[in-house]
Amino acid sequence: MYQPDFPAVPFRLGLYPVVDSVQWIERLLEAGVRTLQLRIKDKRDEEVEDDVSAAIALGRRYNARLFINDYWRLAIKHNAYGVHLGQEDLETTDLKAIQAAGLRLGVSTHDDMEIDIALAARPSYIALGHVFPTQTKQMPSAPQGLEQLARHIERLGDYPTVAIGGISLERASPVLKTGVGSIAVVSAITRAEDWREATAQLLAIAGAGDE
């Protein structure tokens, strides 16, 4: 079977919100979330370093699994729990430096070919998306749906996986029934009428992850 070559993460990372500010990181940690990602796009390292550093410090205070999207140099510098990379970032990132620093690595995938590419890097977890149509970001690929997601899970076996893309409160349970280890959400929390209630309900379904 496939085995990660980066530091391990639990198979069940639980509810995995992806947010764009330190304010959201702090809110969600206080609400009981223990796996989350800071995703700030299209800024220079020096513009985001304070936010990255603050988010990592918060994650450490709560003993949480905080992943930094893309800014891998800053993640290494400030000793983050982990880094998350898109496919387009794999070729331009020093994966050996991330590994040597002891950081976990997550990689996005959208089809079988990208899963092959991710497996070659042997990251800590593989993100599978997008499951449903999403308004959060422009996607060149088509939604995979539950049947395709289940096929990927069967192929990957006990490799840690995260489903992402258009996962709402109503869709969370059907997604988890595919056998995927974790669910990543964005607008299900950040655009909810009551984000605290939405977070509590999603935590009740997906959990906060295994230790």
Swiss-Prot record:
List ligand-binding residues for 2-[(2R,5Z)-2-carboxy-4-methylthiazol-5(2H)-ylidene]ethyl phosphate.
T134, Q135, T136, G166, V186, S187
Q: What does the note accompanying the cofactor annotation read? A: Binds 1 Mg(2+) ion per subunit.
Cellular component, GO annotation? cytoplasm
**Which residues are listed for 4-amino-2-methyl-5-(diphosphooxymethyl)pyrimidine binding in this entry?**
Q37, L38, R39, I40, K41, N69, S108, K137
UniProt key word Protein biosynthesis: no
Q: Which Pfam families match?
A: TMP-TENI
The first-level EC class reads: transferase
Q: In which pathway does it act?
A: Cofactor biosynthesis; thiamine diphosphate biosynthesis; thiamine phosphate from 4-amino-2-methyl-5-diphosphomethylpyrimidine and 4-methyl-5-(2-phosphoethyl)-thiazole: step 1/1
Q: Which UniProt keywords apply?
A: Magnesium, Metal-binding, Thiamine biosynthesis, Transferase
The leader peptide range reads none
Could you say which residues bind Mg(2+) here?
Answer: D70, D89
Gene3D superfamilies per record: Aldolase class I
BP GO terms, sorted: thiamine biosynthetic process; thiamine diphosphate biosynthetic process
- MF GO annotations: magnesium ion binding; thiamine-phosphate diphosphorylase activity
Q: Which reactions fall under this protein's catalytic activity?
A: 2-[(2R,5Z)-2-carboxy-4-methylthiazol-5(2H)-ylidene]ethyl phosphate + 4-amino-2-methyl-5-(diphosphooxymethyl)pyrimidine + 2 H(+) = thiamine phosphate + CO2 + diphosphate; 2-(2-carboxy-4-methylthiazol-5-yl)ethyl phosphate + 4-amino-2-methyl-5-(diphosphooxymethyl)pyrimidine + 2 H(+) = thiamine phosphate + CO2 + diphosphate; 4-methyl-5-(2-phosphooxyethyl)-thiazole + 4-amino-2-methyl-5-(diphosphooxymethyl)pyrimidine + H(+) = thiamine phosphate + diphosphate
For whether the record's keyword set contains Iron, the answer is no
The protein's required cofactors: Mg(2+)
Which NCBIfam families does this chain map to? Answer: PRK03512.1, thiE
Q: Tell me, what does this protein do in biology? A: Condenses 4-methyl-5-(beta-hydroxyethyl)thiazole monophosphate (THZ-P) and 2-methyl-4-amino-5-hydroxymethyl pyrimidine pyrophosphate (HMP-PP) to form thiamine monophosphate (TMP).
What does the sequence similarity comment in the record state about its family?
A: Belongs to the thiamine-phosphate synthase family.
Q: What is this protein called?
A: Thiamine-phosphate synthase
